Amino acid sequence: MLERGGAIGGSSAGASIQGSFLARGDTSGNTIMVGDVQQGFGFMRNTAIDQHLIARGRQKDLLKVLEDPRKKMRKEFNRAELLGIGIDEDVAIVVKGDQFSIIGKDQGLVLVYDPKSWKKETPDAQKWVTLKKGDQYDLAQRSIIPVPPTKK
């Protein structure tokens, strides 16, 4: 369907399942980031998607997936290639090809975690970039797309 120009959507767990790695996919509860169910639908390749980030204080939770300190991630996932995308409440990402844009309420945020840009000494609070309504991101280049200023 996507290859024919169709669209898919999802919020909360419905957004998380669209990544290749399923964050919070444990059958015993949703607080376990790297659980017994790890395979997402893979509509967004090399991604791990989390939700309700700011509303539930989950800003650092995707670090548990991307760093995998307990080494629970299955070998079919290349952790080094994963990009973390955290979507807060009241916002969504609209993906077209290798780019996405943020839609929703002005106060909603999307956090993007790119382990390829981290150094060993990078503090946890600097391991993501914050995007807001109207911002765009290039998944292939792993970079924010500059948006021209709007005329007033």
Give the location of each predicted region.
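C-terminal and late-domain segments of enzyme folds
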Residues: 22-152
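Catalytic nucleophile loop
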Residues: 1-21
